[in-house]
Amino acid sequence: MAENYTPRLKSRYQDEIRPNLQTQFEFSNVMQIPGVTKVVVNMGVGDAARDSKMINGALEDLTAITGQKPQLRRAKKSIANFKLREGMPIGAKVTLRGDRMWEFLDRLLTVALPRIRDFRGLSDQQFDGHGNYTFGLTEQTMFYEIDVDKIDRPRGMDITVVTTAVTDDEGRALLRELGFPFKGEDGKKQ
């Protein structure tokens, strides 16, 4: 890869989106303009408590989707009803920062989300009060990196976009400018 390579979405953010947000919210300081800090992709595998091989498929899928080795998440407490013991692997997560984060967001917005059948847009009510956005995907087949013939079972995932926005409105404006397909008030995609 060339040394002066900049991801497409990152250069669009720097050239177009930052000035738009500064005029829209009338920020006096450029450091007040919201930006994306990191993207966390989490895949919980509850069936791993019964079959320990299930976690390997989740690790392989997350590695293919994000291009980064996932961190294995283990149970903190034993729960008898779920036949779960403390320390058993129950999920995997990847934290993306920098250029990998921008490349993942670009692939997610331009390739993966449009491939979802009957996709009507993301809900814009899933902000946490501080400008961070979390949404869930029901299966991993929408990513081109996953070979549909080789998956053993569909696995969902949670994706959290952490921003430097102070309010939900700033975070919503940032993600809308980046190209997140939010639903409107009437339920239609904007």
Swiss-Prot record:
GO cellular component: ribonucleoprotein complex; ribosome
Keywords: Ribonucleoprotein, Ribosomal protein, RNA-binding, rRNA-binding, tRNA-binding
InterPro entries: Ribosomal_uL5, Ribosomal_uL5_bac-type, Ribosomal_uL5_C, Ribosomal_uL5_dom_sf, Ribosomal_uL5_N
GO BP annotation list: translation
Keyword RNA-binding: yes
Record keyword RNA-binding present: yes
GO molecular function: rRNA binding; structural constituent of ribosome; tRNA binding
Quaternary data: Part of the 50S ribosomal subunit; part of the 5S rRNA/L5/L18/L25 subcomplex. Contacts the 5S rRNA and the P site tRNA. Forms a bridge to the 30S subunit in the 70S ribosome.
Function: This is one of the proteins that bind and probably mediate the attachment of the 5S RNA into the large ribosomal subunit, where it forms part of the central protuberance. In the 70S ribosome it contacts protein S13 of the 30S subunit (bridge B1b), connecting the 2 subunits; this bridge is implicated in subunit movement. Contacts the P site tRNA; the 5S rRNA and some of its associated proteins might help stabilize positioning of ribosome-bound tRNAs.
PANTHER family: 60S RIBOSOMAL PROTEIN L11-RELATED (PTHR11994)
Family: Belongs to the universal ribosomal protein uL5 family.
Name assigned to this protein: Large ribosomal subunit protein uL5
This protein's encoding gene: rplE
